[in-house]
């Protein structure tokens, strides 16, 4: 015998309370990670800086994962090949990164990465799916940069294989990873640009000779060539996967980098 439906019966009241509590809990947790329910992204940022926004003119939308660099989250190292110069010139506090709440959100994301990677990965995958769906609705192409302020070997964590149709890209100071990319040993949907510092110029030249690209920070006007390789303007957009091979990606010094005395910035 079926019982008559009760709009405000005990079961209905219980489920309303349960779902209200669950939604409030989830919203609070995501807010602590820097999430806005209106953005519908947990970990990724879209349109958070001027440079990546320039890609829109080329038909691309960029989502970036910003973590707390180095060991600032009080966990493991996320920039294993950082030098003194790049540490001092780090753009971690540039733009919105200057705000305390933004830095705290990045710290919490990084702590989640180390403390509960399963949850972190689930949130990241949900973000990528939502971002791609949003791009499709807008008639834009999606690209994702996971190392906005970190240098993690994401190819070992199953991210790129899970989204074979999404273009991923990063900068890295790992010569091993950069050479792997130059030799075609990275996932086909992942583009990697090696970052020169004051302590890895020899490796940077090796990467260029192997067919890879290298980002170099210059103090003023970008030269036509560096170490015999053509220089392209890397400040015009952040779409590194559109660059030709065997080029130097010239970047003008910004923020603390303008006062560099380590050799990280090329005079």
Where are the regions that the model predicts?
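Cationic, amphipathic, low-complexity segments that mediate targeting or membrane/lipid association
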Residues: 2-20
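Short, positively charged and aromatic/hydrophobic N-terminal segments
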Residues: 4-5, 27-36
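Replication-associated primase and helicase/ATPase modules
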Residues: 19-22, 33
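Structured catalytic/translocation cores of nucleotide/phosphate-coupled proteins
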Residues: 22-23, 189
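Class I S-adenosyl-L-methionine
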Residues: 34-267
